[in-house]
């Protein structure tokens, strides 16, 4: 780590450049996409980066990130605390200036922070501008300071609210619903970024807590970038055990790099500048690739490796199967945009070159076994590249890849403008025939795919080109294939729609196609050209009514609508009907879904009892005993036994023991379950049902009358009556639909539903490797961990 001098970090360190007015008008310039979730998570990362900068400066070793139940997020560190003194030019506290003025921060003069990732006042002020509210708590100079902001404006000046021996800053914010289409945070996306930061910053303990469901993870990962590479390769097969590692400093800049090759065919390189990831690389990555190629080629020539193998190696060959983490730290880094996806600082290139060249030369000379394995992998890649080039030449001579000859099975459209054209990739000739007859020939092209295409995750490039179905697909798309040939500007369709059956084979074919696009044509995914069709799962008839229903949920909702027609409940002289009946029924069905999902963790009988019980309180042994008594009273003692137990640090739990088919089943009600959205749904439902329907209640459906002593009984009767008059057909294959049905449900742009495929890079890479790679154990573990929560699986 670059040495940090402990200069004064006070109010006069803060420089002011401009205000916040522009941010809400153009949020994408500062935070990224506000609709797809990336900008929302970037809000957290901006605040988190400031805490990490305190760690880089040597003042912080503990950071806590919390997703609160109200969808706000807080980031707390034990650093120096934001300056609280009065800013000499602004006439108000420096903390308020940092939070309300764009480009106000302590990172412009290189004194308060020599190395920083974010500009503490660019990021955090943008977060303030795009939030409904922000609270800032500062522990500094023996005092606790507090200030609250509403939509970027100070509600009242910073004030001292008490004495404290703590140090640090806590920022809590609620993202603005006007700016962001959705403020649901993903625990996994935040955990991914925090894991990166933990590897990159040894000695910093970062904790992530989700109050919505009680999930918690602690990150105190060691090993630096080498440990990071080992983690990235955990689901792959490394070719050599020893990981290459390099570290060096020059002119106030540092370079740290780790590399390890595996048996896959994909390159996986993560680049960071002052802990900030660069998705699009930049000058540090360019320098790394150049020095790698030059250094390894020198070793190969000196040892006549390529000469003996009779091949010529290139830079791409050296990066096949490479997993690498490159982390650079430098003062005043320059990026191509505020989102910092690409580094443009030219001064880092020579430092990367010098550090990597010397370290890699030494590594290859001092570790002959590793060098032999790595160069052997490179030679194999060079042979495969040459074979692929020959395969391309053969296919080009046949007219396959230059657009002169289109596949015979492609039913092309009349439209020549790619932006107005769409290609349906359809499973099987039967469905392909229906799609051809049902389509709009003007702009819809159809390509039937026979059987399952090749799994490109396991296949070399030349083998992929030899696959007839893959070659047909490449030809139809018209954009070529491979780094030398692929040109997305030549793509013939800007909507590529995958349309497969709603069964296991259909899901497999869809996954194979997505693997192909992700690995071979990622540009098409990033540009938003790949879609998944959503054909209906059901066709339902009720009297003269006929409906296509997308999935199980839509079927249940339609059935509920039919069940509630001309229905009412009369209990204790009160009539429940119309909107009140519908809202309560929807709430109850939601609770049933929650019970079904949560029964993996908590006994189902007890979950059902919660719908008739008071909210559970486990804050003390007395309250826990009350909850045990109430729940036990709602259950038959032969069904389940409940008891209070005390856990670590006095935490209260309820243990549930139940005998089922001769087996003893044990589950627990834990404090974290009571903080979950699932339990909130159950308590809301219990409140809605309380006193609603009692003994002697009557249910009326049209002219019929039924006895119903509970709301659940009434709803069961209504759903049963509705189902009697309904006939449901489940579509397993697209071929079961005639052309007219396929058009009106799945292909008509005015009514169809399409899912646009978007990918979060690092998570996607891991999932594809797990599901489509060679290793059986990670795939088995993934299936076992997710089988119970998977939906729409056909037996």
From Swiss-Prot:
Molecular function as annotated in GO: ATP binding; DNA binding; DNA topoisomerase type II (double strand cut, ATP-hydrolyzing) activity; metal ion binding
This enzyme's EC code(s): 5.6.2.2
Residue numbers binding Mg(2+) 2: 501, 503
Miscellaneous field: Few gyrases are as efficient as E.coli at forming negative supercoils. Not all organisms have 2 type II topoisomerases; in organisms with a single type II topoisomerase this enzyme also has to decatenate newly replicated chromosomes.
InterPro entries xrefs: DNA_gyrase_B_C (IPR002288), GyrB (IPR011557), GyrB_hook (IPR049353), GyrB_insert (IPR041423), HATPase_C_sf (IPR036890), Ribosomal_Su5_D2-typ_SF (IPR020568), Ribsml_uS5_D2-typ_fold_subgr (IPR014721), Topo_IIA (IPR001241)
Annotated site, Probably responsible for antibiotic resistance, chain positions: 429
Protein name per the record: Antibiotic resistant DNA gyrase subunit B
Cofactor: record remark: Binds two Mg(2+) per subunit. The magnesium ions form salt bridges with both the protein and the DNA. Can also accept other divalent metal cations, such as Mn(2+) or Ca(2+).
Subunit annotation: Heterotetramer, composed of two GyrA and two GyrB chains. In the heterotetramer, GyrA contains the active site tyrosine that forms a transient covalent intermediate with DNA, while GyrB binds cofactors and catalyzes ATP hydrolysis.
Catalytic activity reported: ATP-dependent breakage, passage and rejoining of double-stranded DNA
Feature type site, description Interaction with DNA: 452, 455
Main location: cytoplasm
Coiled coil: none
Cofactor list: Mg(2+); Mn(2+); Ca(2+)
GO cellular component term of the entry, any: cytoplasm
Sorted UniProt keywords: Antibiotic resistance, ATP-binding, Cytoplasm, DNA-binding, Isomerase, Magnesium, Metal-binding, Nucleotide-binding, Topoisomerase
Keyword match DNA-binding: yes
PROSITE patterns linked: TOPOISOMERASE_II, TOPRIM
Any matching Pfam family: DNA_gyraseB_C
Cellular compartments annotated: Cytoplasm
NCBIfam families named among the record's database cross-references: gyrB, PRK05644.1, PRK14939.1
Task performed by this protein: A type II topoisomerase that negatively supercoils closed circular double-stranded (ds) DNA in an ATP-dependent manner to modulate DNA topology and maintain chromosomes in an underwound state. Negative supercoiling favors strand separation, and DNA replication, transcription, recombination and repair, all of which involve strand separation. Also able to catalyze the interconversion of other topological isomers of dsDNA rings, including catenanes and knotted rings. Type II topoisomerases break and join 2 DNA strands simultaneously in an ATP-dependent manner.
GO biological process, one term: response to antibiotic
Segments forming domain Toprim: 421-536
Binding site residues for Mg(2+) 1: 427, 501
